[in-house]
């Protein structure tokens, strides 16, 4: 089992980046972002280094799943209030692991459950549509910069 858990040959890709400038403001869409030990520069949740929810990531495929549940053609990633949309790698399999995006290293700390804002942003049923599809949270281990199109790689020696 340990060998199976350590096998992550897939390399993901950053599809979208957004920061939350202030409470209840729309996310600001970015092509690249600077990351300090306190979080994403420009994000309102940037703060104390080492916090478990400094960065949020969501699976690109989950946008399609949530849209399908809500009978929508598509969903604007900004409505989901997550920082990074990733394709090509299973984020849920990365819990307690470190990932590298550009020269930034993050440690995936846990699930990112939906908040009541999902009902407001997505309409009636939005909260329940997001359950089990809300993505993951991460803390910053190494600061740097990354952009849309950059690879998302699991660092294999990082299981906690």
Regions found by a protein language model. Give the residues of each.
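Metal-cofactor-dependent catalytic cores
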Residues: 1-160
């Amino acid at each position: 089992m340990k060998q199976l858990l350590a096998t992550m040959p897939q390399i993901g890709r950053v599809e979208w980046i957004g920061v939350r400038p202030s409470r209840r403001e729309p996310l600001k869409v970015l092509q690249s972002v600077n990351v300090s030990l306190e979080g994403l520069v420009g994000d309102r949740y940037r703060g104390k280094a080492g916090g478990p929810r400094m960065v949020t990531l969501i699976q690109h495929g989950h946008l399609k799943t949530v849209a399908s549940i809500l009978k929508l053609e598509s969903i604007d990633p900004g409505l989901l209030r997550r920082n990074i949309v990733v394709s090509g790698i299973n984020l849920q399999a990365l819990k307690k692991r470190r990932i590298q995006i550009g020269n930034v290293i993050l440690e995936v700390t846990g699930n990112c459950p939906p908040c009541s804002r999902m009902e407001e942003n997505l309409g009636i049923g939005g909260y329940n549509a997001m359950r089990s599809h809300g993505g993951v949270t991460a803390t910053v281990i190494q600061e740097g910069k990354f952009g849309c199109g950059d690879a998302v790689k699991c660092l294999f020696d990082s299981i906690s």
